[in-house]
């Protein structure tokens, strides 16, 4: 008799995706982040759902409703901080997942990669709108500054911004629609994740060597389920330490002051996971140029498969490319630091140099280095 998991119409989809899925025998812990991202998404949807039951998306009561959740709702404080710090864990896993793809050449699966880039944009949009909801000072001014960037678009810019705001400034209409979209987007993201997995399972997983592993596959369960559970336990440990010991470490103190359109905070800055892009935006003195650079800092991921000039897929056996990769990582960390600093000397020039280096490494230095490596290997 056939096992029910292989014959039942629903169970066989689960079986072919998570149980009997053939996986390369040599994938390392860098391949854990996909499953961790799935768990992060589930956690964010669950905690967000319970928070939405108590939150009110009205400018008069939004700030107080968040306070009410933390003080009066049973375990509301842990829901709120799991959701806020869960977003940070989400982005840590996202950036490590993208970094893994860059290092091991996973971007050569272009459909999977491009859906992944769209997912990154969707998650960033969701996180930005979520940051506006507590209606603190940084929520209000962050929303004002970032949405205002669209006014740099020629001809339609100003009308577009007012259309998004639902008025002539960030106000009640803006908060209500941001809450609606913040609630809706994670479900769209869930559907996109399924498409991401669909494309991934068409080709099978890449592996650290970058060499096809069709001749040496093992079932996903129990080997990688156990491995994923270990990664999950480590992530949950870090998340709970954050939530229970220093829940506000990654937040901004200004967000504990209710939004006041008449009082601008001295340093307007987004959450830490957007600081690298914010630094690139600020490094260009021209408004439209800054917006273009901001979008390109993420959109550049789409053209990476076309910039791959190496005869090898992975960087495992390419020491020169490895040096450039880690220089890029250091550069992005520098940009993250600069994004949180005031706009004054020497931070301005450091930000500009780091921004130039960021684009130079990806567009010029990496393809050239790959060609040099091909030549050295006489390929």
Curated annotation (Swiss-Prot):
InterPro entries to which the protein is assigned, alphabetical: Cyt_b/b6_C, Cyt_b/b6_C_sf, Cyt_b/b6_N, Cytb/b6-like_sf, Cytochrome_b, Cytochrome_b_C_euk/bac, Cytochrome_b_N_euk/bac, Di-haem_cyt_TM
Residues annotated for heme b b566 binding in this entry: 97, 196
Main location: mitochondrion
PANTHER family from the UniProt entry: CYTOCHROME B
UniProt binding sites for a ubiquinone: 201
Record-level Gene Ontology MF annotations: metal ion binding; ubiquinol-cytochrome-c reductase activity
Cofactors required: heme b
Self-association and partners: The cytochrome bc1 complex contains 11 subunits: 3 respiratory subunits (MT-CYB, CYC1 and UQCRFS1), 2 core proteins (UQCRC1 and UQCRC2) and 6 low-molecular weight proteins (UQCRH/QCR6, UQCRB/QCR7, UQCRQ/QCR8, UQCR10/QCR9, UQCR11/QCR10 and a cleavage product of UQCRFS1). This cytochrome bc1 complex then forms a dimer.
Taxonomic lineage from the root: Eukaryota, Metazoa, Chordata, Craniata, Vertebrata
Domain of life: Eukaryota
Function: Component of the ubiquinol-cytochrome c reductase complex (complex III or cytochrome b-c1 complex) that is part of the mitochondrial respiratory chain. The b-c1 complex mediates electron transfer from ubiquinol to cytochrome c. Contributes to the generation of a proton gradient across the mitochondrial membrane that is then used for ATP synthesis.
Keywords (A to Z) from UniProt: Electron transport, Heme, Iron, Membrane, Metal-binding, Mitochondrion, Mitochondrion inner membrane, Respiratory chain, Transmembrane, Transmembrane helix, Transport, Ubiquinone
Alphabetical list of PROSITE patterns matching this protein: CYTB_CTER (PS51003), CYTB_NTER (PS51002)
Pfam families in the cross-refs: Cytochrom_B_C, Cytochrome_B
Record-level GO cellular component terms: mitochondrial inner membrane; respiratory chain complex III
Record-stated family: Belongs to the cytochrome b family.
GO biological process: mitochondrial electron transport, ubiquinol to cytochrome c
Name of the featured protein: Cytochrome b
Remarks, miscellaneous: Heme 1 (or BL or b562) is low-potential and absorbs at about 562 nm, and heme 2 (or BH or b566) is high-potential and absorbs at about 566 nm.
SUPFAM superfamilies reported in the protein's UniProt record: a domain/subunit of cytochrome bc1 complex (Ubiquinol-cytochrome c reductase) (SSF81648), Transmembrane di-heme cytochromes (SSF81342)
Cofactor: binding details: Binds 2 heme b groups non-covalently.
């Amino acid at each position: 008799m056939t096992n029910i998991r292989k014959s039942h119409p629903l169970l066989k989809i689960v079986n072919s995706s998570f149980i009997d899925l053939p996986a390369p025998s040599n994938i390392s812990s860098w391949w854990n982040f996909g499953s961790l991202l799935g768990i992060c998404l589930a956690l964010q949807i669950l905690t967000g759902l319970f928070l939405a039951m108590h939150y009110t998306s009205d400018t008069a009561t939004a700030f107080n409703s968040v306070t009410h959740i933390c003080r009066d709702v049973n375990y509301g404080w842990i829901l709120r901080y799991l959701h806020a710090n869960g977003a940070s864990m989400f982005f840590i896993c996202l950036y490590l997942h993208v970094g893994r793809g860059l290092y091991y050449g996973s971007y050569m699966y272009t459909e999977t990669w491009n859906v992944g880039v769209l997912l990154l944009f969707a998650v960033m949009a969701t996180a930005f709108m979520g940051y506006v909801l507590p209606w603190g000072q940084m929520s209000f001014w962050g929303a004002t500054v970032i949405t205002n960037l669209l006014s740099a678009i020629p001809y339609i810019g100003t009308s577009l911004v007012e259309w998004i705001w639902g008025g002539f400034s960030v106000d009640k209409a803006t908060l209500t629609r941001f809450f609606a979209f913040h609630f809706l987007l994670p479900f769209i993201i869930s559907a996109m994740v399924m498409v991401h997995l669909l494309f991934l399972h068409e080709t099978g997983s890449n592996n650290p060597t970058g060499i096809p592993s069709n001749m040496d596959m093992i079932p996903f369960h129990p080997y990688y389920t156990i491995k994923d559970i270990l990664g999950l336990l480590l992530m949950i440990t870090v998340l709970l330490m954050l939530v229970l010991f220093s829940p506000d470490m990654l937040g901004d103190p200004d967000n504990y002051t209710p939004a006041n359109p008449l009082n601008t905070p001295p340093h307007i800055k987004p959450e830490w996971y957007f600081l690298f892009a914010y630094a690139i935006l600020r490094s260009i003195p021209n408004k439209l140029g800054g917006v273009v650079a901001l979008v390109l800092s993420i959109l550049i991921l789409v053209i990476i498969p076309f910039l791959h000039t190496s005869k090898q897929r992975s960087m495992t056996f390419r020491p020169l490319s490895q040096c450039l990769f880690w220089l890029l990582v250091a550069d992005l960390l520098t940009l993250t630091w600069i994004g949180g600093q005031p706009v004054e000397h020497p931070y301005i020039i450091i930000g500009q140099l780091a921004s130039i280096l960021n684009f130079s490494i990806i567009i010029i230095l990496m393809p050239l280095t790959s060609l040099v490596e091909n030549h050295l290997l006489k390929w």
